[in-house]
Amino acid sequence: MHAWLFALLAAAFVLYTDDYVIAGILPELANDLGVTEGEAGQLVTVFSVTVALAAPVAAVALARAPRRHLFAVALLVFVAANAAAASTPSFAVLMVLRIVAAFAAASTTPAIFAFAARHAPAEKVGRYIAVVALGVTGSIAAGVPVGTWVGSAFGWRATFTAMAVAGALVLLAVFVTLPRQNGPDETPVLREQLRILGRRPILLGLLANCVLMTGSMMMLTYLAPYLAAATTAGVEERALTFSLSGIAGIVGIWLGGIATDKWGADRTLLFGIGAIVATMIALWALWAARPAPLPVVLAVATVWGGMAFWNSPAIQARLHLLAGPVSGQALALNTSGTYLGVSIGAALGGLALSGHGVGALPLTAAGFALGALVLLAFARQADTATHQMR
């Protein structure tokens, strides 16, 4: 595999860590800037919302920009925003700087995946996407904990300084390793871009990803209350569950990439989503038989953690294949759908927890996974019909 692929992995790791890392330094940041922790938490919200809204717009507006230049400029803006965040005394200014950093991430993240897929050998598209996606799971498993440790040891401003330094190193790696282009990417006119993106197989696939993420994040967001209700697990055991799920996610995303190349996206998704449904039903059964044996719950949660990330390479490889010359724009919309699913999942999970208790969470999540499977079946049917018409 090429050196530039690992530079893009590092870029994904840094960009996603920057989104989530604030969660670990909220108390210190809020106290220093004179705001409540709830207000400080909006720094995470505004970053995620900005990425979700800006990613498709940036993908269309910057479609013809040489990728090497796009990544370099965006990462430079990212570095500057984090360096400034490390020294600002104002919460309002920090909020603006988070929006600036989010714009940089929005213009870069989908393009990174599209670049990896476009420059991968045909038989290794899934694996190339999986390598970059390891940066996403790695940010959750390692980036956020390390950023939190830096903040607790040296102050919250040191976390932003560390992000700026990491961004600068990634900028250097990308600029050195990424191949030069002879000219701008050939991109269809806007009307043709919208026509391609509006095809039913693509729209249904995008919706399926959003629905699948809604169910997955519903369970992940409220996994701690589930463990507390279904088992006798304490804080340490709950932390172990999250750690095992995170490690399984790293393994799952790599195996999902290999499966995509060997089985194809559709079979990979059928297996992955089917496994999610099975683990959700198992978690419900364990809750119904509470107190459930902790080792069994740990095993099921670990399998679920792996399967939750298994599907990502297949979803993106499928969109890349269907969207062709506008795969970057399709993956940007997929990024928006992912963030939307995260938000909806947390909200609906809270409603399910309040209205029906912990036991409703795994069954509701299983329902969303089945819904995603149905949407993907319709998407495949629509794609088959389109090819027959040709």
Describe the role of every protein-language-model region.
Residues 53-89:
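Conserved MFS/SLC helix-loop-helix module at the cytosolic interface between two early adjacent transmembrane helices
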Residues 77, 81-84, 92-101, 295-303:
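Paired small-residue
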Residues 267-314:
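C-terminal transmembrane helical hairpin of 12-TM major facilitator-type secondary transporters
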Residues 68-71, 94, 269:
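Primarily marks hydrophobic transmembrane alpha-helices of the MFS/SLC 12-helix fold
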Residues 32-34, 66, 87-93, 232, ...:
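Helix-breaking motifs and short loop linkers at transmembrane-helix boundaries and internal kinks
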Residues 91-93, 121-179, 226:
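Helix-loop-helix hairpin linking two adjacent transmembrane segments in secondary transporters
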Residues 54-67, 252-265, 353:
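Helix-to-loop junctions at the C-terminal end of transmembrane segments
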Residues 97-136:
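Cytoplasmic helix-loop-helix junction between adjacent transmembrane helices
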